[in-house]
Amino acid sequence: GDDVGPTKAIDEADLDDTNYYQLLGLEKSGIGVDADLVKRAYHKALLLYHPDKGSAKYETDAVFLAVQKGYDILKDKTKRRAYDSTNEFDDTIPKGNEGDQPNFDFYATYGPVFRANARFAEKMPVPELGDANSEEKDVENFYAYWVRFESWRDFDLETQSKEVHEEMDRYEKRHMKKENAKLAAKRKREEMERIILLVERARANDPRLKIFAEQLKAAKLEKRRSRENLRQA
């Protein structure tokens, strides 16, 4: 189909500002794209960038190699996840003190942040934050899911700052790999702490939880009153 694949060639000078999804014309599909779609986009990119067919106007070789590399990464689920983990992502979460502001909108503040982080969810489907009319069980399910959130975000690529070179001896190589793995594990821990903090801040500011707590308190009080009335009767 004509719905995927690059429509216009990218100049070599713009390669640094182009991610593999853009290069292969898959930016609309985004992460989670299936292998068949990647293959179709790659074939279209080959027609556009193949050095034999490329016009002299473009320095196609560097771009062509980038297309090859992009295809190699995006068609493979494990490699793609590692790439998606390093691809620009906004790690910021609400500060947690927004409730002090007069025009604070809990759903507009926290909803998009949970939705954005859901891209890394191992377990599907991911429950939505909902709104003021959400039922108590749905709100409980939402928080139960996020407290146990399993992220597939992978920091192996990001932490490979220490390159493992072929000319290194095996002890050096082993040491470098160990250091990189240690760094990746540290980033993963920080990532989980970030998600837990997001959940804690959301819970502290969720107006529905306050309402549910008040309703529970009122129900208990009512129960106690009716017991006392029975005793007095």
Residue ranges and their predicted role:
Residues 57-64, 82-92, 99-101, 161-164, ...:
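Short amphipathic alpha-helical segments embedded in low-complexity Lys/Glu-rich regions
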Residues 1, 111-233:
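Accessory regions outside conserved functional cores
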Residues 28-30, 87, 150:
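Residues that form ligand- and interface-recognition hot spots within folded domains
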Residues 14, 29-36, 58-61, 74-77, ...:
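Intrinsic disorder
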Residues 1-54:
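N-terminal J-domain/J-like co-chaperone modules of DnaJ/Hsp40 proteins
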Residues 19, 37, 41-44, 66-69, ...:
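Acidic, Ser/Thr-rich intrinsically disordered and amphipathic helical segments
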Residues 32-49, 59-87:
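J-domain helical core
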Residues 1-15, 92-112:
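Ubiquitin/ubiquitin-like proteostasis machinery centered on ERAD and p97/Cdc48
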